[in-house]
Amino acid sequence: MAHNIYENVVLSNKVNEILETKVNLNSYMTIDTTLSANAGNKIKVNTYSTTSGVEALSMGEGNTKDIEVNFTSKEYEVKTYQGRFAFYDEQEQADPMVVDTGLDGAAKDMINQFNALAIAEMDKATLTHEATAWGFDVVADAIAKMDIENEAGLFLLVSPADQAAIRKALKDNLSYSEGFVRTGYIGNVCGVPVTTSKAVPSGKAYLGTKEAVTVFIKKDTETEYDRDADTRANKYFVRKVGVVALTNAYKVVKITIGA
């Protein structure tokens, strides 16, 4: 049996197809590719917030305070996220699905890595909401804390461990939209799609829009193949180079249940 070797461009397309099928990162994070045009391995990210300053005034009165713009600046280091899949010719000869299965696993690991990074950034949210148990009011109150007029684009990420409790608590308030198909999707509440992610710890949830977290891509999905002809050992490398950062602290609410 001749050995089946993928060209790198074919391999890259296969991995990208898997990534797009498993999860659409654009739904939960903003993708920024400006790093690819700039030299250097560090990026300074400013996270902005504003103070309230609108007041009810009587005739002749003026404002007693200003609306202020504040920001915190943090330097991030660009990192390489890489997965390696290895197998021997004999393994593929015994089971032709070895390569496709390995690529699927590498893509899932990449997804899990970026999801975990995004959740870690969301956990830095300045807007928080605490509740003793799940309920319709938990989501409604969290939305109110965002103080936004247009709720389109909101999502709620929860832990799979809390899925049963959420279903029981929300009951008829949890509706299903056939137009919203995502891995882990369990329904809508207050018009917001609820999706599970293994990166979310039990007892926590994150309500937000994709403007909260930005993925700064230095290099998009890159693949590389290496083979030792003597031992018939094959290695496929899948990598992305970039930074995941919280860029708008007012576009995400950290919900803590059981507080």
Stretches found by the model and what they are:
Residues M1-F71, V213-E224, D230:
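N-terminal "assembly arms/tails" that initiate or stabilize quaternary assembly
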Residues R227-A259:
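Extended, compositionally biased alpha-helical segments that mediate assembly or anchoring
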Residues G53-A56, D95, A165-K168, A245-T247:
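Short helix/loop capping segments that flank catalytic or ligand/cofactor-binding pockets
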Residues E61-Q93:
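Long, hydrophobic/aromatic-enriched structural stretches that serve as scaffold segments
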Residues A39, D137-A140, A144-A229, K240:
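Extended oligomerization regions of viral-like shell subunits
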Residues Q82, A86-A152, K254-A259:
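Alpha-helical scaffold segments that mediate packing/assembly in large oligomeric complexes
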Residues G102, K171-S175, V252-V253:
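Short, solvent-exposed amphipathic alpha-helical segments in soluble enzyme
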